[in-house]
């Protein structure tokens, strides 16, 4: 099986919430960067699916408002955060600032969750705006920071 970057991260030595550069790839005419936007401490807590799903919908738009070149935002299967893919180079500090602002936008969001209707969403019943706001508030209160990659030690 091919190597997967996140499987070589020592999840016991990182401290959420954080922003971490998880990968950078040069392509013809540019660079693509992947960022680990971690909200919950690995193996200690996880976001409920409704809150995670709603954060995905809201952050997909709000991050684009604050950070040019966003390609994709995807939730992690472990439900502790998101992967953000951007045209780079951007840098962790810029991503951190945009992420913090987008979380503030989530807190201020009123009304319907964008893209959450039967026709727009593959699981439209699984949304939780109050839960999404609670996680945004928790992360902002804890304070985001840049996290260095901590590789697993040789076994």
Curated annotation (Swiss-Prot):
Positions annotated to bind Fe cation: 53, 57, 121
Catalytic activity of the protein: S-(5-deoxy-D-ribos-5-yl)-L-homocysteine = (S)-4,5-dihydroxypentane-2,3-dione + L-homocysteine
Cofactor stoichiometry and binding remark: Binds 1 Fe cation per subunit.
Enzymatic class: lyase
The organism's place on the tree of life at top rank: Bacteria
Cofactor(s) for this UniProt protein: Fe cation
GO annotation terms (biological process): quorum sensing
InterPro entries, alphabetized: LuxS_sf (IPR037005), Metalloenz_LuxS/M16 (IPR011249), S-ribosylhomocysteinase (IPR003815)
Record keywords: Autoinducer synthesis, Iron, Lyase, Metal-binding, Quorum sensing
Enzyme Commission (EC) number: 4.4.1.21
Pfam families documented for this protein: LuxS
Single GO MF annotation: S-ribosylhomocysteine lyase activity
Assembly: Homodimer.
Name listed for the protein in its UniProt record: S-ribosylhomocysteine lyase
Organism: Thermus thermophilus (strain ATCC 27634 / DSM 579 / HB8)
């Amino acid at each position: 099986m091919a190597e997967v970057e996140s499987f070589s991260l020592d999840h016991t030595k990182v401290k959420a919430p954080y922003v971490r550069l998880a990968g950078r790839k040069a392509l013809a005419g540019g660079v693509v960067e992947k960022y680990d936007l971690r909200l919950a401490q690995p193996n200690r807590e996880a976001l409920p699916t409704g809150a995670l799903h709603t954060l995905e919908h809201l952050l997909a738009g709000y991050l684009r408002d604050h950070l040019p070149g966003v390609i994709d935002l995807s939730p992690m299967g472990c439900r502790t955060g998101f992967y953000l893919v951007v045209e780079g180079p951007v840098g962790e500090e810029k991503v951190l600032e945009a992420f913090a602002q987008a979380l503030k936008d989530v807190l201020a969001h009123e009304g319907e969750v964008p893209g959450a209707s039967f026709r727009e969403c593959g699981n439209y019943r699984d949304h939780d705006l109050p839960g999404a706001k609670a996680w945004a508030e928790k992360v902002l209160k804890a304070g985001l920071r840049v996290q260095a990659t901590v590789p697993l030690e040789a076994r």
